[in-house]
Amino acid sequence: MQKFTFFVSCAKGIELLLKDELERLGISSQEKLAGVEFEGSIKDAYKVCIYSYLASQVMLKVATDKVINQQDLYEFISSINWMDYFAVDKTFKIIISGKHYDFNNTMFVSQKTKDAIVDQFRNVTNQRPNIDTENPDNVIKLHLHKQFVNVFLCLNIDSLHKRSYRQFQGQAPLKESLAAAILIKAGWLEELKKHQPILIDPMCGSGTILIEAALMAKNIAPVLLNKEFKIFNSKFHNKELWDNLLEIAKNSQKVTNAIICGFDIDNNVLDKAQRNIYQAGVEDVVTVKRQDIRDLENEFESEGLIVTNPPYGERLYGDQLDELLDIFNGFGDRLSQDFYGWKVAVLTSFADSIKEMQLRTTKRNKFYNGAIETILYQFEINEHAKFKHETQLEKNIRIAEASVQKSDEHIDFANKLKKNLKSLKPWLKQTGLECYRLYDADIPTFAVAVDVYGEHIFLQEYRADATIDQNIAKQRFYQAIYQIHKTLDIKYENIHTRVRQRQKGKEQYQKENDKNKFHIINEFDAKFYVNFDDYLDTGIFLDHRKIRQLVAKAAKNKTLLNLFSYTCTASVHAALKGAKTTSVDMSNTYLEWGKNNFELNKLDIKKHSFIQADCISWLKTNKDKFDVIFLDPPTFSNSKRMDDILDIQRDHELLINLAMDSLKKDGILYFSNNYRRFKMSPQILEKFNCENIDKICLSRDFLSNKNIHNCWEIKYKK
């Protein structure tokens, strides 16, 4: 029997499964990209067309050559004796795949190929074969790769994955061949060797997985379901052989005692599944019923296999994403509680849903559902399956303990902590402070800031430079956690971490979660609430300690306007010295925090004003005059509550002028910002008495970072 070279195409990711499938048909093949290649007879190729659950196209290899221009292409196609492949009265169509270095237009390649074939027939027979793009007798495929053109003659006119049973489908249909692939990968063929195989799809949708499982259980050749299947009408086609093989396939079907069950919460989808099941002729094996996956019960006498392809997160669920995650959390609970000994496979592109199951995966395999990359996650439900949820604290401890085994650089960091603490101790004893900066990127390789808040540490990681390996930066961060715990004798749970970098859009100044854990700290004669876990900052800026004291001293028994007041810490210090304060901030959250700070210090909030407003807009309409104003704007802000974006370098002149309009003639404006390259407006310097007080406002614990802020005392000229 004459031998040919055939290429059998398939979806990316299932090449090895296809190779194994051909082995079961007695065909030895080689794995290629998106398919396999084998040497064999037309009979072998027919067997693949009839029995393969995984193949897309079976193609006879005609020729391959290097082609660098359109003349080369025409001559190459003309060199093939097309009359050996099909008669002039047979129609054909051309399909193109791949990419070629010299041909950007596949329409051109198709046209040139057609011209070469038609010209050859016309020159020999004075007739030409016709093109039929809808229902051709033969399909010629050109696959382009770099400068090579591979020519194939397709045995199956339409794709083999089409089974014709899927008349009704849901929103996100799974290709029949991919459903078959994940069943095989999940172990359905092995399950079929049991006395009573069991398969469940708890989110069955329109039933594709169930039907493919039933076809395998009943040994139904997929081609028998494709009512529109058409084999090529080539001179190589052996109709008698083809018909005999089809008859053998029909007679090879068997009765099975397999139990195949599908569940879904949507009655409309279940109705589609039921109709597809009848269309496929497997209603004697497959049953479906309505049930929430979170209520899944094991009503079976032995262990089996669960295979499902749930909706892919946001693609289908959108605003109901939380509901999807809850579904998977419940699914994981049902599996671990009621399906001991079962095997489970879940195909999804949405990893968060898998995490919610809290089960250990035993295997992960990549598949493609069309262009969508998906992962098949497999589980074995046993005593080791349930994955204990690891808290962030437990994760930090585990990684921190492991990180110090990888290098010794952390020893230098530990020594620096000890040295800094020893240096600060006399000053801390003198001031009685319990909150201070202990370390600020003193060693470049440990780019962190360590702030002490009594028994707590606020550890801020500066964004690593682009030239620094991100894995090394992360390793050093965890080494810092370990050494803070060990060197400073701080409990791991009291080490609170944050990455310091410019925030974008919704990342700016929003709560990260709802932990709401507040702690009380002392600063001189004041007490404040701080929060280490829920906000980007703790509620107090330690580097502003001295300017808060200056403001409070100047405002003693006077009026204070605190602009961009944050949590009103400067207002509290001033109020404790008898000042009547007005605090203005856009954030109601921080103003409420500020009120709590007042009450913590036994200050009557009714005697003070707290105003939620855009400071610039408020200043433009304010008529009151104040003895002291503290103006401490952010470097940059694009809050939706503001009328415009705030850029401190650009806008400080406007801000200062507006603030001075609210200042009494003998008053003081304290202006502060944290922009390191800040330059005071020459017009402001000319218009008012301005004194830079950076050095006065720099505390002992911030001496290593002298550019941390810009502080100015501004008065009217006499």
Curated annotation (Swiss-Prot):
Keyword set includes S-adenosyl-L-methionine: yes
Reaction it catalyzes: guanosine(2445) in 23S rRNA + S-adenosyl-L-methionine = N(2)-methylguanosine(2445) in 23S rRNA + S-adenosyl-L-homocysteine + H(+); guanosine(2069) in 23S rRNA + S-adenosyl-L-methionine = N(2)-methylguanosine(2069) in 23S rRNA + S-adenosyl-L-homocysteine + H(+)
Entry GO CC: cytoplasm
InterPro entries: 23SrRNA_methyltr_KL, DNA_methylase_N6_adenine_CS, RlmKL-like_Mtase, RlmKL-like_Mtase_CS, RlmL_1st, SAM-dep_methyl-trfase, SAM-dependent_MTases_sf, THUMP_dom
Classification via Pfam families: Methyltrans_SAM, RlmL_1st, THUMP, UPF0020
Cellular compartments annotated: Cytoplasm
Intrachain S-S bonds: none
Keyword annotations of the record: Cytoplasm, Methyltransferase, RNA-binding, rRNA processing, S-adenosyl-L-methionine, Transferase
EC number: 2.1.1.173, 2.1.1.264
Keyword Metal-binding: no
GO molecular function: 23S rRNA (guanine(2445)-N(2))-methyltransferase activity; RNA binding; rRNA (guanine-N7-)-methyltransferase activity
Annotated ranges, domain THUMP: 44-155
UniProt function note: Specifically methylates the guanine in position 2445 (m2G2445) and the guanine in position 2069 (m7G2069) of 23S rRNA.
Family of this protein: Belongs to the methyltransferase superfamily. RlmKL family.
Name of the protein this chain belongs to: Ribosomal RNA large subunit methyltransferase K/L
Organism of derivation: Francisella tularensis subsp. novicida (strain U112)
Gene this protein is translated from: rlmL
